[in-house]
Swiss-Prot record:
This is Nucleolar and coiled-body phosphoprotein 1. The gene is Nolc1. The modification N6-acetyllysine is found at residues 33, 424, 668. Acidic serine cluster repeats lie at residues 84-95, 127-138, 170-181, 231-242, 274-285, 335-346, 373-384, 434-445, 479-490, 524-535, 559-570. There is a cross-link at residue 424 (Glycyl lysine isopeptide (Lys-Gly) (interchain with G-Cter in SUMO1)). One of its GO terms (cellular component) is box C/D methylation guide snoRNP complex. The modification Diphosphoserine is found at residues 88, 91. One of its GO terms (biological process) is regulation of translation. It is found in: Cytoplasm; Nucleus, Nucleolus. It comes from Rattus norvegicus.
Amino acid sequence: MADTGLRRVVPSDLYPLVLGFLRDNQLSEVASKFAKATGATQQDANASSLLDIYSFWLKSTKAPKVKLQSNGPVAKKAKKETSSSDSSEDSSEEEDKAQVPTQKAAAPAKRASLPQHAGKAAAKASESSSSEESSEEEEEEDKKKKPVQQKAVKPQAKAVRPPPKKAESSESESDSSSEDEAPQTQKPKAAATAAKAPTKAQTKAPAKPGPPAKAQPKAANGKAGSSSSSSSSSSSDDSEEEKKAAAPLKKTAPKKQVVAKAPVKVTAAPTQKSSSSEDSSSEEEEEQKKPMKKKAGPYSSVPPPSVSLSKKSVGAQSPKKAAAQTQPADSSADSSEESDSSSEEEKKTPAKTVVSKTPAKPAPVKKKAESSSDSSDSDSSEDEAPAKPVSATKSPLSKPAVTPKPPAAKAVATPKQPAGSGQKPQSRKADSSSSEEESSSSEEEATKKSVTTPKARVTAKAAPSLPAKQAPRAGGDSSSDSESSSSEEEKKTPPKPPAKKKAAGAAVPKPTPVKKAAAESSSSSSSSEDSSEEEKKKPKSKATPKPQAGKANGVPASQNGKAGKESEEEEEDTEQNKKAAGTKPGSGKKRKHNETADEAATPQSKKVKLQTPNTFPKRKKGEKRASSPFRRVREEEIEVDSRVADNSFDAKRGAAGDWGERANQVLKFTKGKSFRHEKTKKKRGSYRGGSISVQVNSVKFDSE
């Protein structure tokens, strides 16, 4: 699609395409929410679909995109992860477009954002309806970015340079590498990635736009820069993730935006957004995985609501996201290579690090999970909202200092993930979404930790770097990238556990989640499987928050030590075993209730069933079988006409003195072959019967 054509496009032009795409893919719930949020109507049946547009775009835009993308995007194209390359192209186009429109004016910005939509729409088709929705959010974000600061364009130019680094880093960990690049490009880039997250938050929460705009300016420079550079390379993944996350967020955003606006307060979200550049990448990674799952379930578009949702999921999902956020920040601080390896590490380390991170918030998540998910989400969002504002204030302060920025970015990143997590918590209601929710809750925890202890973050970074190094040990899968980012963040959080405890207030309930987080992190290699197992664990952990609290207290300190991690993992294993006993699908409590109900009901029903069959059917059947073989026709039940009752020769009229009487006397005793033999002998011999009578001895039945 030519730039001129894209500039003419308006975001609303894509709504029908997205709506049609969602409906075509049987995402009726998402489609209905999207239609309500955007007021879009079904497109003409003859109009081209998003898939068609995307396929055309792939064919027509590759060469021009290479030129536009230049450094970072080209490298990514070389990588050519199908979805990531597409998303990178989309992000690069969006970045290029964003730069031009930002310079031109707000109106051009809208156009640029729309073109991005078009590019995103193509990406959406490949990514799925969630990616489409996210692309729309990205368009909105682009618009916001442009009006917020045209300055961002300069950062973009700077950011463009870092993409090569990302290209150098493994593609599978492009998200983590993008996080690394943020630190490498020097915290402005981190701010840029954070800026992307803020833009998402802004689009998600309309109420926040004012403060986010403030936060964005800081992040905006970073936004444009990192969004253009890191987003061109990492944002290829990020854009995909953002698209997916954004799509769900957009759909749920209208409803949850209100909730998020009230509890989170704009200031906290903006600051977190700005600092959450790294987190945004990790979140996006998770979101990429989750959006598909989330589509089926409810979405929380607003980061604050996501926090509340994340609290619910904190027990299960928070461990992953928290770990991802803390570890990504650490890995980003350490180096892009470490971040790449960190994604791998995250698979291994998440289990260890997650335990310490989740302890503070996980318990609340369990509690919330116990309470209705919606009410608990709102409560958790409110609770976390105060914590986030604090972190927001701290993160801006920390930004001036170069070292503080990485922590701030981490803390901020956690907020973004919470936003993603917000959506995930809802999906969490769905089992598949449980892992996503866990990551979101962990992100929220990471934000609190960062708020309470900026210094601790620095220390955490040092510690996480070691885990990041370990990460290379575990080969990173593309799926493990999100987990790896979360595990990296979690690595950062381990030093923070004291801060988390402080933020936790009642640490005991939160520690319970720590075990969950540990179990989840340990199972990070298979996040979805782990999430289901973790969910099982959560119900049990909820039942016994105190022991877990004790464990959580021990865990944070021990997490730094391998022994502590191992012990935590063992605890997680025990929890998993216990939970394994429970049913896999559904929330732990629900499962328990269902199981108990089933057990209570089934025994009675079984007893009843046993009694009935044993008594009536079995006795009757047994008696009948024992007494006689099966008879379709029972003699005693049928009345036979007397005329037909006896068919013997003697019973017939005129039998006495009949011509065949003598023969009958001889033959009536023989049956089978011998009867024919005997009859033949009688015919050949000198047999002489009586006189042959012409009387009719047959029986005549009157038609009745």
